[in-house]
């Protein structure tokens, strides 16, 4: 096999990024931003999705697309993922007085986390000693990740839900079909993949698919992500979608930004 200079440069760049990420963990350079989830019928803020960000002191905010794959490939995501759960729950405590009710806090779970044998215990350790009643924890796991080993994952997710943690299956409809298993999956909510909403107001096929998904999941909470226009929001309300999330309502916010958002929350309708 012949190696081109470009290949060597690529390997060196990856190794350098790995070293920077190790340093980022040691120096606590990771932060969380949050995007609100809105109840469609009332416009009320009902939750926040925590989004991992890397605040590099030299480069500023680094795109998640650049560093999350490396965290997953190297196994560093196990440590960072546990930190994200605790950090999100800790930061959310400050929002309770200004919100006036339970505010669900969603944290994304990567495939490498879910496949760990001790994943259930790691979640238990992450929430140990934290009050999750006022800010219930949600774990968002993609449909394709759940379906990779559906029988094993059903067992893990059921054990986690028994702790009082909600399970959201995200990117629903984008990959492996979970419909045959939907009745058996211990999930509280489905988050419909954002690809459906790019054309939901212009193509009848997209609208039919979204309407069908909402109807099939009538016993679950259905969340639409990637809602960026008032027309999309209006149609989703007509289709009885339970919750919405997207830049129409708010771009991802810092923890301080969430506090300000909740104080002046006035959601576009």
Which residues fall in each region the model found?
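Conserved ATPase "switch" residues in P-loop NTPase domains
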Residues: 25, 96, 161, 266
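The catalytic core of metal-dependent phosphodiesterases that act on cyclic dinucleotides
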Residues: 105, 124-200, 214-252
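Active-site core of bacterial EAL-family cyclic-dinucleotide phosphodiesterase domains
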Residues: 1-70, 108, 169, 224, ...
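Conserved N-terminal phosphate-binding loop of PLP-dependent enzymes in the Aspartate aminotransferase
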Residues: 209
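Catalytic core of bacterial c-di-GMP phosphodiesterases, primarily the EAL and HD-GYP domains
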Residues: 4, 10-12, 40-49, 76-152, ...
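C-terminal helical cap(s) of enzyme catalytic domains, especially alpha/beta-barrels
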Residues: 21, 237, 253-269
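Structural preference for long, well-ordered alpha-helical segments in enzyme cores
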Residues: 17-20, 24, 50-51, 66, ...
């Amino acid at each position: 096999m012949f190696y081109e200079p470009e290949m060597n440069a690529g390997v060196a760049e990856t190794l350098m990024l790995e070293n920077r990420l190790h340093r980022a963990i040691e120096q606590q350079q990771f932060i969380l931003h949050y995007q609100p989830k809105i109840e469609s019928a009332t416009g009320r803020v009902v939750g926040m999705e925590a989004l991992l960000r890397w605040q590099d002191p030299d480069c500023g905010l680094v795109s998640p697309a650049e560093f999350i794959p490396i965290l997953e490939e190297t196994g560093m995501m196990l440590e960072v993922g546990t930190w994200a759960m605790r950090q999100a729950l800790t930061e959310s405590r400050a929002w309770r007085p200004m919100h006036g009710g339970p505010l669900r806090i969603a944290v994304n779970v990567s495939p490498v986390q879910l496949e760990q044998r001790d994943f259930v215990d790691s979640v238990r350790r992450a929430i140990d000693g934290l009050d999750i009643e006022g800010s219930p924890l949600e774990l968002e796991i993609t449909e394709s990740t759940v379906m990779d080993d559906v029988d094993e994952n059903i067992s893990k997710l059921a054990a986690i839900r028994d702790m009082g943690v909600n399970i959201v299956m995200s990117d629903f409809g984008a990959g492996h079909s979970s419909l045959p298993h939907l009745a058996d999956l211990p999930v509280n909510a489905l988050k419909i993949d954002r690809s459906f909403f790019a054309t939901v107001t212009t193509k009848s096929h997209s609208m039919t698919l979204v309407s069908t998904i909402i109807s099939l999941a009538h016993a679950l909470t259905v969340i639409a992500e990637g809602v960026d226009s008032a027309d999309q929001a209006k149609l989703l309300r007509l289709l009885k979608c339970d919750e919405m999330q997207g830049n129409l309502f708010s771009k991802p916010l810092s923890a301080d930004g969430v506090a300000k958002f909740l104080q002046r929350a006035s959601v576009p309708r």
